[in-house]
């Protein structure tokens, strides 16, 4: 599994509605194409600054997404119209874990 971490700050004069429309369009592209091995996305922040965590099955899938023509055009538009600045990083997940209280039969299982 591979996670891309993207932190952005939008320009003060940014058309936030247009930015969100473009984000939705890119989400539709990445989710409809199995070649990108997209797992999911979490977004945190407000209208002008945020962090996006994108999860892919593999680094290779994330690289294919970074080369997607629609995504490349969106990145170019983002630099021209929306972003004041951004930074990204990625990491391969070496382990993961989960907890789901609903799957327990009783609280006694915690002890």
Please report, for each region that a protein language model flagged, where it lies by residue.
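Metal-dependent phosphoesterases centered on the DNase I-like endonuclease/exonuclease/phosphatase
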Residues: 75
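Short S/T/G/P-rich N-terminal loop/turn motif that feeds into the first structured element of a domain
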Residues: 1-50, 59-67, 83-111
């Amino acid at each position: 599994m591979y996670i891309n971490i993207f932190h952005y700050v939008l320009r003060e004069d940014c058309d936030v509605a247009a930015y969100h429309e473009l984000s939705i369009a890119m989400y539709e592209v990445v989710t409809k194409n199995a070649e990108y091995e997209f797992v999911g996305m979490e977004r945190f922040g407000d209208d002008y600054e945020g962090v996006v965590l994108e999860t892919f099955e593999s680094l290779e899938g994330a690289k294919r997404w970074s080369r997607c023509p629609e995504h490349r055009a969106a990145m170019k538009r983002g630099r021209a119209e929306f972003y004041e600045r951004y930074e990204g990083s990625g990491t391969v997940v070496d382990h993961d874990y989960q907890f789901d209280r609903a799957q327990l039969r009783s609280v006694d299982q915690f002890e």
